[in-house]
């Protein structure tokens, strides 16, 4: 009975330490009960993102800009008792849990378990969304949803570059990322912003980022409804299709040029036709970017 009582008491004490201050400390990036000492500049910050916003922004002189090396963090400060100590999940002084999720490899703390954090050894960092829902693509060198397994277009180091819209580095971004049909990646929010501005092609390779068949049908109707003047009706131009990569020779039209191979209007003119009267004959045209 006594042993059971003491065991229950210990369990209750552990539960209390897990909850004391939970959700009340941290920053705009993470809820956590500790701060970190940056190994690069020896200053104290709530998290690595807070450090990078302060030390790697445009208002800092370029030769002073730097990012925090997350794996080199060795000291943390408990937010409740302010004790500085080696990296560990529970405070060495007051015993409070400094993060319900703790990764000793990334020196990472987070009290919000709803993110379903997990550490990927192949990525070398912690990710969110639940390990059971993701797989690591060795060629793309990042974690993707299992829905995409054996279904995505591989691109070497797909997320090891900046977003082509906002230029934030994608690999360790905390914002949602989408994989386009061509295999290139960008922030989901940036993709939606492109849609608001009627931009439906990949900023990297110019391929269509969604099913454009309905728009192509409308363009078929538009082209049929507006025949070219007699001086242009026999004019032929060479076009390159951004979607399938084919070079085809098609009839010139002011509205759009349709790929003879795949039927896409996401094309651009690559060579002057036989008739030089048109001022637009040498201009590139990407109809897929209009909506």
From Swiss-Prot:
Zn(2+) 2 binds at residues 40-41, 51, 66. Its EC number is 2.3.2.27. PROSITE patterns: ZF_CHY, ZF_CTCHY, ZF_RING_2. Zn(2+) 1 binds at residues 27, 29, 47, 50. Zn(2+) 5 binds at residues 120, 123, 136, 143. Zn(2+) 4 binds at residues 103, 106, 119, 126. GO terms for biological process: protein ubiquitination; regulation of stomatal opening. GO terms for molecular function: transferase activity; zinc ion binding. It is found in: Nucleus; Cytoplasm; Endoplasmic reticulum. One of its GO terms (cellular component) is endoplasmic reticulum. The modification Phosphoserine is found at residues 173, 208. A zinc finger (CTCHY-type) spans 98-162. It is an enzyme of class 2 (transferase). Disruption phenotype: Decreased relative stomata aperture under normal growth conditions. No visible phenotype under normal growth conditions, but mutant plants display decreased sensitivity to abscisic acid (ABA) during seed germination. Induction: Induced during sucrose starvation. Repressed by sucrose. Induced by cold, drought and salt stresses, and abscisic acid (ABA). Zn(2+) 6 binds at residues 137, 140, 152, 154. A zinc finger (CHY-type) spans 20-96. Pathway: Protein modification; protein ubiquitination. It catalyses: S-ubiquitinyl-[E2 ubiquitin-conjugating enzyme]-L-cysteine + [acceptor protein]-L-lysine = [E2 ubiquitin-conjugating enzyme]-L-cysteine + N(6)-ubiquitinyl-[acceptor protein]-L-lysine. Residues 271-291 are annotated as: Disordered. Changing residue 187 to Y: Abolishes E3 ubiquitin-protein ligase activity. Possesses E3 ubiquitin-protein ligase activity in vitro. Mediates mainly 'Lys-48'-linked polyubiquitination. Promotes abscisic acid (ABA)-induced stomatal closure, reactive oxygen species (ROS) production and drought tolerance. Involved in the regulation of stomatal aperture. Interacts with SRK2D/2SNRK2.2, SRK2I/SNRK2.3 and SRK2E/SNRK2.6. This is E3 ubiquitin-protein ligase RZFP34. It comes from Arabidopsis thaliana (Mouse-ear cress).
């Amino acid at each position: 009975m006594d042993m059971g009582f003491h065991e229950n008491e210990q369990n209750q004490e552990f539960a209390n330490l897990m909850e004391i201050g939970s959700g009340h400390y941290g920053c705009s990036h993470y809820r956590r009960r500790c701060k970190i000492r940056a190994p690069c500049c020896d200053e104290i910050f709530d998290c690595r993102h807070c450090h990078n916003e302060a030390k790697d922004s445009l208002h800092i002189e370029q030769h002073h800009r730097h990012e925090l090396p997350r794996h080199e963090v060795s000291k943390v400060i408990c937010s409740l008792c302010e004790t500085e100590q080696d990296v560990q999940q529970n405070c060495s002084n007051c015993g409070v849990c400094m993060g319900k999720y703790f990764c000793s490899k990334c020196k990472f703390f987070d009290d919000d378990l709803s993110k379903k954090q997990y550490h990927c050894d192949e990525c070398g960092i912690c990710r969110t969304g639940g390990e059971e829902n993701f797989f690591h693509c060795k060629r793309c060198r990042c974690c993707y949803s299992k829905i995409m397994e054996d279904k995505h277009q591989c691109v070497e180091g797909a997320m090891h570059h900046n977003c082509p819209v906002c230029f934030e580095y994608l690999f360790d971004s905390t914002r949602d990322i989408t994989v386009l049909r061509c295999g290139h990646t960008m922030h989901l929010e940036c993709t939606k912003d492109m849609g608001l501005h009627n931009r439906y092609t990949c900023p990297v390779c110019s391929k269509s980022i969604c099913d454009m068949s309905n728009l192509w049908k409308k363009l078929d109707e538009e082209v049929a409804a507006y025949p070219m003047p007699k001086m242009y009706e026999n004019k032929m131009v060479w076009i390159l299709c951004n979607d399938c990569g084919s070079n085809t020779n098609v009839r010139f039209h002011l509205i759009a040029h349709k790929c003879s191979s795949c039927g896409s209007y996401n094309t651009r003119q690559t060579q002057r036709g036989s008739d030089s009267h048109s001022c637009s004959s040498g201009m590139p045209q990407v109809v897929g970017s209009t909506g």
